């Protein structure tokens, strides 16, 4: 995602990992082979990038490397939705991380959103939390992936267990790329904890929220 690529690279470095960004089909399999984790981000999508995503994802599966999907904008166009669904069909993802609108689109196989942000009607609240948890667990069961739904309240779930995470700051949603940064961080956490996908994903979400809270404190006068 060219919009957020520099911020994501710096976030991965801050986690102690070493980022390399590539979307070229010619060398993507070679690049993927030297990495322990793959973060497929669907921002700035085009057919050439889809080809690279497919090649990189399949190579990572072959090598038993960690793979994360960030389905940016799924539901905002049929092109994006179809591309995301094809990726889920063809590649085994360790984690799928998105906002609630993107995840609902992928779980249902169709949907509409107003862009890369979650629709207001889809907002995860204390009132609909009990209904959403079984929905997310079922999507995890069907995909074999940990599902991370991020927003005001975060859910990180496999088919059996679900972490509900309430931290962070609402102001984080006003910064472009915080979700992309989290996906980069989460991929690093997965690569460092290969036997614990659920816990690694939840730890990344917690760390991002705590970082936001700490940053907010430093921004206050006095």
Show which residues each predicted segment covers.
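Short, small-residue-enriched loops and turns at beta-alpha junctions
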Residues: 45-48, 73-77, 155, 172
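Acidic, glycine-rich active-site loops and adjacent beta-strand->loop/helix elements
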Residues: 72-76, 102, 153-154, 206-211
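Conserved phosphate/ATP/ADP-binding segment of small-molecule kinases
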Residues: 80-162
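Short pre-catalytic strand/loop immediately N-terminal to key active-site residues, enriched for Gly-Thr
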Residues: 163-177
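Conserved post-catalytic alpha-helical subdomain immediately downstream of the catalytic base
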Residues: 176, 185-222
